[in-house]
Amino acid sequence: MDKIFLIDGHAQIFRMYYAFMRRPMVNSKGEDTSILFGFTKMILELINTEHPTHLAVTFDPPAKTFRHTAYPLYKANRSAAPELVKAALEPLQDILKAFYITVIMMPGFEAEDVIGSMATQWKGNNTHI
């Protein structure tokens, strides 16, 4: 049986941002590496404890999605993402690719929409998602 893990990368980035907010990890250059450390640690723990056969991390695209077209006020009251969150996206994707973990970002679709579609496609195919 396949053991598939689909992770919402943006949700985890925010989780790490808030987890380390009071005690950030900073490298020798003074750069905050908390998000990268926390996310990488979470992925390694997942791999070592769950032993997935498939693993993918999805991210929200930088442009608006179909939800904004359908409902123009979608996320209208949400404040902009913190700079640390924005700055973590590219290096985090590089780290994941270095681990040969599939990174998915589909224009027009948020990470959770991609996860929902993929889970629906795999449902019942001798998989544990």
Q: In which residue ranges do the predicted regions lie?
A:
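Noncatalytic, basic helical substrate-engagement surface that gates or grips nucleic-acid strands
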Residues: D2-I129
